[in-house]
């Protein structure tokens, strides 16, 4: 079957080997998990997606609670902070960029629009020491970007300007979409109008949601992981287990 052969050829060129899921904290009152992801490539690269909460949570983050942080979880996989080659920043919120500075050898990858907005936005002031790194260590991307074969960044503004979701292609599992905060809960993954008009970013959120729904249909994505969905999260394999 030529088509099957051809698809096999395409899949064999994908560089991603494993995906680990780590819960690094929570919002106990709302039963919401705070999570990071680790992608390992066939050629031994370690790519972290987000870094969780800061070690010391500032006052405005009083709803958050640290669990086993990203550094401890990586250690349980035999990895030190210096082993991380790349940190993908989905966005600079407190619960996503709180440990960026620990990864002293990594290149940070972020949407240009988000990084530029963050510079003057008080929302990201608390995490600024984490994400405000020398520019030679930051790779700014513009819109949807294939970072490497099997790892794609999907621009999904709305939750914040320049938010990005991540599409991972695994050899056995196939495609997994990490929506992150573009769609934090499964019930939000719908084409229906959801907002009562009170959210100024409702239109952008809706556009990004529809963009991801279209992507899932077009690429036949079998698994969509929402950013903060406790019920769904409980069904997943967590590190040290992995998806491959």
Task: Say what each PLM segment does.
Residues 3-61, 211, 218, 235-244:
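Zn-dependent metallo-beta-lactamase
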Residues 18, 45, 86, 106, ...:
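The start of beta-strands in P-loop NTPase/AAA+ ATPase cores
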Residues 20-22, 47, 88, 109, ...:
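Hydrophobic/aromatic beta-strand patches that form the interior of the parallel beta-sheet core
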Residues 29-32, 157-161:
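A short catalytic or substrate-binding loop motif that flags glycine-/basic-rich loops and adjacent residues
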Residues 54-57, 68-79, 83-95, 107-155, 161-238:
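Metallo-beta-lactamase
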Residues 100-104, 170:
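Short, conserved loop/helix-junction motifs that constitute active-site signature segments
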């Amino acid at each position: 079957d030529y088509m099957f052969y051809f698809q096999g050829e395409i899949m064999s060129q994908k560089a991603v080997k494993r995906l680990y899921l780590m819960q690094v904290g929570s919002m106990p009152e709302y039963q919401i998990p705070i999570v990071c992801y680790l992608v390992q490539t066939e050629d031994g690269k370690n790519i972290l997606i987000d870094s969780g909460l800061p070690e010391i949570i500032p006052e405005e983050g009083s709803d958050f609670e640290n669990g086993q942080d990203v550094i401890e979880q990586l250690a349980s996989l035999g990895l030190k902070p210096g082993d991380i080659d790349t940190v993908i920043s989905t966005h600079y919120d407190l619960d996503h960029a709180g440990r960026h500075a620990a990864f002293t050898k990594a290149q940070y990858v972020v949407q240009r629009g988000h990084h530029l907005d963050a510079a003057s936005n008080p929302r990201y002031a608390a995490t600024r020491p984490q994400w405000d790194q020398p520019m030679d260590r930051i790779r700014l991307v513009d819109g949807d970007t294939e970072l490497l074969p099997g790892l794609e960044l999907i621009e999904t503004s709305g939750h914040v300007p320049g938010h990005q979701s991540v599409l991972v292609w695994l050899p056995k599992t196939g495609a997994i979409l990490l929506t992150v905060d573009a769609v934090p809960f499964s019930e939000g993954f719908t084409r229906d109008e959801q907002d009562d008009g009170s959210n100024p970013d409702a239109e952008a959120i809706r556009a990004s949601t529809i963009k991801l729904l279209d992507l899932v249909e077009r690429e036949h994505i079998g698994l969509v992981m929402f950013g903060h969905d406790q019920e769904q999260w409980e069904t997943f394999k967590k590190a040290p287990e992995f998806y491959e």
